[in-house]
């Protein structure tokens, strides 16, 4: 009988990085800032990147570079996750997949240079394809300032925001607009996501250590009380303890990647069943690919806008076939699980 080959889990951590490492031509995995789009054409439009609840533009949360070995059409492959920054709408989540063959219209056939360019370069507001990007969020921008004809936006909301934060004064200085992009307090802080393989031995060892500590703390407790405690231990407690033991060795992990594995849940409530995960538009089933951990919230500084972006787990499910539908961006599925409040 052939040995079962375990599927490795890659853990993601945030790390400061020079700006050049987070640009499209470096194929980054990253948090925050503007999206480093993969295909530089056929980007998702404003309608696809609007909150289904409030209609406001979604903010770019993170992207994961996840090529599929042995799949020529997915030699380059990235997943882009967006969320709503409004306090009542942080369930407004959307995720998109994009993939390209090694030989494509946008990037060199050879690997990118490891030497960085100057980090003083201006914000990229127009792609090589000619598509304009929003000055506020870096997404596709079909709207244009009617006065200067040089500033582009994804929505009326972002045009108004930019006008209030300086474009009103800079509008007549169109030659310098690329160098005059203010901080709109809309983007999340930008970090590179670096990965390492999870040590499969760790969680069991930690769990046994935790168990020993618990046993030690229960010395002298009457047997009747122990029986009562055991009866009241809920499935919820068990799942949360399993979650804690799983991440104990690497508590700073903000992402877990493992295509086709099972996610780890933080709560016994709101765990999706197979019927809850819609099939891909191509007809194939979707499988789990990665999850965003609550630890990422510590790095987002979401409170600076007075908002309350929050989650327990964000689990991303993608087409099992990773179907190729041209160079466009295919929407996938994200499941949000909140942290259950204990009484």
Swiss-Prot record:
MYND-type zinc finger positions in the chain? Answer: 134-171
Q: Which UniProt keywords apply?
A: Apoptosis, DNA-binding, Metal-binding, Nucleus, Ubl conjugation, Zinc, Zinc-finger
State its location(s). Answer: Nucleus
Maturation and modification: Ubiquitinated by PRKN, promoting proteasomal degradation.
Q: Which GO terms describe its cellular component?
A: cytoplasm; nucleus
- Give TM regions: none
Q: Name one Pfam family in it.
A: PDCD2_C
Q: What induces it?
A: By irradiation and dexamethasone.
**From what organism does this protein derive?**
Rattus norvegicus (Rat)
The UniProt entry, under PROSITE patterns, shows: ZF_MYND_1, ZF_MYND_2
State the superkingdom. Eukaryota
| MF terms in GO | DNA binding; enzyme binding; zinc ion binding
Gene Ontology BP annotations: apoptotic process; positive regulation of apoptotic process; positive regulation of hematopoietic stem cell proliferation; programmed cell death; regulation of hematopoietic progenitor cell differentiation
Q: Which named protein is this?
A: Programmed cell death protein 2
Q: What is the recorded function of this protein according to its Swiss-Prot or TrEMBL entry?
A: May be a DNA-binding protein with a regulatory function. May play an important role in cell death and/or in regulation of cell proliferation.
Q: Which residues bind Zn(2+) 2?
A: 145, 148, 167, 171
Task: Show the taxonomic lineage.
Answer: Eukaryota, Metazoa, Chordata, Craniata, Vertebrata
Residues that hold Zn(2+) 1 according to the record: 134, 137, 154, 158
Question: Does Ubl conjugation count among this protein's keywords?
Answer: yes
Gene name in the database record = Pdcd2
The question of whether Zinc is a record keyword is answered with yes
Coiled coil (residue ranges): none
């Amino acid at each position: 009988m052939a040995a079962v080959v375990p599927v490795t889990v890659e853990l993601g951590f945030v790390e400061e990085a020079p700006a050049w490492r987070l640009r499209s031509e470096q194929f980054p995995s990253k948090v925050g800032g503007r999206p480093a789009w993969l295909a530089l054409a056929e980007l998702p439009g404003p309608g696809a990147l609007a909150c289904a609840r409030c209609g406001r533009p979604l903010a770019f949360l993170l992207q994961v570079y996840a090529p599929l070995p042995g799949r020529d059409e997915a030699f380059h492959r990235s997943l882009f996750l967006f969320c709503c920054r409004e306090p009542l709408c942080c369930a407004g989540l959307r995720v998109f997949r994009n993939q390209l063959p090694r030989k494509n219209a946008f990037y060199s056939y050879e690997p990118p240079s490891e030497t960085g360019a100057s980090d003083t370069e201006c914000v990229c507001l127009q792609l090589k394809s000619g598509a304009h990007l929003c000055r506020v969020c870096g997404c596709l921008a079909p709207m244009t300032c009617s006065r200067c004809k040089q500033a582009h936006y994804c929505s009326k909301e972002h045009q108004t925001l930019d006008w209030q934060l300086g474009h009103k004064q800079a509008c007549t200085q169109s030659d310098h607009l690329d160098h005059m992009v203010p901080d709109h307090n809309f983007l999340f802080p930008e970090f590179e996501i670096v990965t390492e393989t999870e040590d499969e031995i760790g969680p069991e060892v930690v769990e046994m250590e935790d168990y020993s500590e618990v046993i030690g703390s229960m010395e002298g407790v009457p047997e009747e009380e122990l029986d009562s405690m055991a009866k009241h231990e809920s499935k919820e407690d068990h799942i949360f303890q399993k979650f804690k033991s799983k991440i104990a060795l690497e508590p700073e992990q903000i992402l877990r990647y493992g295509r086709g594995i099972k996610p780890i849940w933080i709560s016994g409530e709101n765990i999706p069943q197979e019927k809850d995960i819609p099939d891909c538009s191509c007809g194939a089933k979707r499988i789990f690919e990665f999850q965003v951990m609550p630890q990422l919230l510590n790095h987002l500084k979401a409170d600076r806008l007075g908002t309350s972006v929050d989650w327990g787990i964000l689990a991303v499910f993608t087409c099992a076939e990773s179907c190729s539908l041209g160079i466009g961006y295919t929407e996938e599925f994200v499941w949000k699980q909140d942290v259950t409040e204990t009484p």
